[in-house]
């Protein structure tokens, strides 16, 4: 007798994997089970290694995730494998369940097998929810609050159960820590349930597409179905690797899983009364099944339903449809805190510099150029400009070289990249919206390269691949790139081109452009009190990655920095009193902005002037009140 059959432990492996008799007619839909086992192993292994570096404390969770992504060797691969593996886990599980529904795998004598699978499905969803809440993920605190509040529907004791789950009066540190503990524990319970699932499967064996007993024609699992499983395993690993390494955040959308899904799966095993089995022999049932699957595949977020009705004409007037369905609606050109989201000034398209250095003589962005100086910029060179412009306005241009380089480096940080092709030459690519074509055209005039329309999307791409242009571009942005991933690429390109790599400069009041905050992630609003607005407030939200930069501005301008739990772990810096606003307003006079938020900033001094006059509550029919209404309309229009 073979050793694999005589050994106590190997005989179990032999009966389940090697000599297990399988129907010869099963197709590739039966490969989903082996893929689910692979997904479970990937999730457990990557989860264990990430847990070695992750901290579940609410104050450290976000920082520990950043630590995994930046400092842990291949930590970003672990995290993306875990996140995308979870998405593929559910995809394969849904296909596995669809196969069971289509081929009637829930019927007797496999009722226990089906019910154990439903329990595994529920535990998997619970594990995914706990994981989303741990690291300020998709659901975050809001999702944890909503889902746990479902228990409040239980009569009499519902609210007490919710408080017990939270460990307090709201989702806080105890909640996240216990969620992480359960997120670590439940996968091992799932693994135990998988063993029970295999035990139930081993009793009656697999079903088959024909719907008849498979005992008439069975073949051993090895080597026939083992190699058949390996085909889908390699295909699965290839597709998973494509998402992990090339598009790791594509599958990060929320998935709404309804309770009715569990009920249907459980009732399928007890409600089937037909003498005939399997949908493939029933035309009407088969058609209905395909309609259900098509409906699930076409399900989208609620706002996308606007396209399916005649509401489009009504929304077009408010420009809502274009915003909802713009793929870049929440994407800034670059996300670094010291760079700004801006368009190149159209009036400077033919402006050139006679100097040999790579720095521009005048600012080429909409923040550093006022309209009344555009004509002068196009006629006079910098020497004549210095004689004409007063000292007050000259401060606008004195740091233009640094600002242009930071702005260009910001493009590369946010939506462009450096790369080396086959260790032969370096290249740089930048992608922007169509309306910003002039911006790329001016970069093309300065450094060379090509500008082309991207197919399939409303975007335009700048590409630079010649050595001379790359040397000029690198010298222009060297020391200004702050994104860690781009720094790695930038360093490799510098080595290839024999250029000294410069570390990112530290932000100061002289070399950082503060107005960029308010276009990318800052607001300038008014607080309301009744009908009159009390005071303006300026707010910036950043992650802990940029906290040290914001702390510098707190030292310069004052204000407060606090941790906002409701905004996915962001730090907020805000100033909201007249003295600090005056300091901030005076500083930004040298950095004019044409963005809507920048226009509001320069209305602050007028706001305080009018508000001080209105302090005595003038009657609403006076000229002073009418002046206030006129100012209010101007503020809203900006």
UniProtKB/Swiss-Prot annotation:
MF terms in GO: endonuclease activity; RNA binding
Alphabetical list of CDD domains matching this protein: Cytochrome_b_N (cd00284)
Enzyme Commission designation: 3.1.-.-
Region described as COB exons 1 to 4 encoded: 1-253
Pfam family, one: Cytochrome_B
One of the record's GO cellular component terms: mitochondrion
Entry annotated with the keyword Nucleotide-binding: no
GO BP field: Group I intron splicing; mitochondrial electron transport, ubiquinol to cytochrome c; mitochondrial mRNA processing; mRNA processing
Alphabetized UniProt keyword annotations: Hydrolase, Mitochondrion, mRNA processing, mRNA splicing
Cellular localisation: Mitochondrion
Modifications made to the protein after synthesis: The mature protein may arise from proteolytic cleavage of an in-frame translation of COB exons 1 to 4 plus intron 4, containing the bI4 open reading frame. Cleavage would take place close to the Met-385 resulting in an active maturase of about 30 kDa.
SUPFAM superfamilies: Homing endonucleases, Transmembrane di-heme cytochromes
COB intron 4 encoded: region residues: 253-638
Subunit composition and interactions: Forms a ternary complex with intron derived RNA and the imported mitochondrial leucyl-tRNA synthetase NAM2. The proteins do not interact directly with each other.
Family from the record: In the C-terminal section; belongs to the LAGLIDADG endonuclease family.
UniProt function note: Mitochondrial mRNA maturase required for splicing of intron 4 of the cytochrome b (COB) gene, containing its own coding sequence, and intron 4 in COX1, coding for the related homing endonuclease aI4. In vivo splicing requires in addition the imported mitochondrial leucyl-tRNA synthetase NAM2. Both proteins seem to stimulate the intrinsic ribozyme activity of intron bI4 through binding to and stabilizing specific secondary and tertiary structure elements in the RNA.
Other information: Residues 385 to 638 are sufficient for maturase activity.
Protein name stated in the entry: Intron-encoded RNA maturase bI4
Organism: Saccharomyces cerevisiae (strain ATCC 204508 / S288c)
């Amino acid at each position: 007798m073979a050793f694999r059959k005589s050994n106590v432990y190997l005989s179990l492996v032999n009966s389940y994997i090697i000599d297990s008799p399988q129907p010869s007619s099963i197709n590739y839909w039966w490969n989903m089970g082996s893929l689910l086992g692979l997904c479970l192993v990937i999730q457990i292994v990557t989860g264990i290694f990430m847990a070695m570096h992750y901290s579940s404390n609410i104050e450290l969770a976000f920082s520990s995730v950043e630590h995994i992504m930046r400092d842990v060797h291949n930590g970003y691969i672990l995290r993306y494998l875990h996140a995308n593996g979870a998405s593929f886990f559910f995809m394969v599980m849904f296909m596995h369940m669809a196969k069971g529904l289509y081929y009637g795998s829930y019927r007797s004598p496999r009722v226990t097998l089906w019910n154990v699978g439903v329990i595994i499905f529920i535990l998997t969803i619970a594990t995914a929810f706990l994981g989303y809440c741990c690291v300020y993920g998709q659901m975050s605190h809001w999702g944890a609050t909503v889902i746990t509040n479902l228990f409040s529907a239980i009569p009499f004791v519902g609210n007490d159960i919710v408080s017990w789950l939270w460990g307090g009066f709201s989702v806080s540190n105890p909640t996240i820590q216990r969620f992480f503990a359960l997120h670590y524990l439940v996968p091992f319970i799932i693994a135990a349930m998988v063993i029970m699932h295999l035990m139930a499967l081993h009793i009656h064996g697999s079903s088959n597409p024909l719907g008849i007993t498979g005992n008439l024609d069975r073949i051993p699992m090895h080597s026939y179905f083992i190699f058949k499983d390996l085909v889908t395993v390699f295909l699965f690993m290839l597709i998973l690797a494509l998402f992990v390494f090339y598009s790791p955040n594509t599958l990060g959308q929320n998935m709404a899983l309804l309770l009715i899904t569990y009920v249907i799966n459980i009732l399928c095993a007890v409600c089937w009364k037909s003498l005939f089995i399997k949908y493939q022999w029933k035309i009407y049932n088969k058609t209905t099944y395909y309609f259900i699957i098509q409906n699930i595949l076409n399900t989208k977020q609620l706002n996308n339903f606007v396209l399916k009705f005649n509401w489009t004409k009504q929304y077009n007037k408010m420009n809502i449809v274009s915003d909802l369905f713009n793929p870049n609606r929440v994407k800034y050109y670059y996300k670094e805190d010291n760079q700004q989201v801006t368009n190149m000034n159209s009036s400077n398209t033919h402006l050139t510099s006679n100097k040999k250095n790579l720095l521009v003589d005048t600012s080429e962005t909409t923040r550093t150029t006022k309209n009344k100086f555009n004509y002068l910029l196009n006629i006079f060179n910098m020497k004549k400009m210095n004689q004409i412009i007063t000292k007050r306005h000259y401060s606008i241009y004195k740091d233009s070289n640094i600002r242009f380089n930071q702005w260009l480096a910001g493009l590369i940080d946010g939506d462009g990249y450096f790369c080396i092709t086959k260790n032969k030459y370096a290249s740089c690519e930048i992608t922007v919206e169509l309306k910003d074509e002039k911006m790329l055209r001016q970069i093309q005039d300065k450094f060379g390269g090509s500008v082309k329309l991207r197919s399939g999307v409303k975007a335009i791409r700048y590409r630079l691949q010649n050595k001379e242009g790359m040397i000029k571009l690198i010298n222009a942005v060297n020391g200004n790139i702050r994104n860690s991933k781009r720094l790695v690429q930038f360093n490799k390109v510098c080595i290839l081109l024999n250029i000294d790599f410069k570390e990112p400069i530290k932000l100061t009041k002289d070399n950082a452009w503060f107005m960029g905050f308010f276009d990318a992630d800052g607001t300038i609003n008014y607080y309301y009190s009744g009908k009159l607005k009390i005071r303006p407030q300026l707010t910036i939200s950043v992650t802990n990655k940029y906290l040290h930069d914001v702390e510098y501005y707190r030292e310069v301008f004052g204000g407060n920095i606090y941790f906002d739990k409701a905004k996915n772990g962001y730090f907020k810096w805000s100033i909201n009193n007249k003295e600090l606003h005056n300091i901030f307003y005076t500083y930004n006079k040298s950095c004019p902005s044409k963005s809507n938020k920048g226009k509001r900033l320069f209305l602050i001094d007028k706001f305080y002037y009018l508000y001080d006059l209105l302090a005595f509550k003038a009657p609403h029919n006076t000229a002073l009140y009418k002046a206030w209404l006129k100012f209010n309309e101007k503020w809203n229009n900006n």
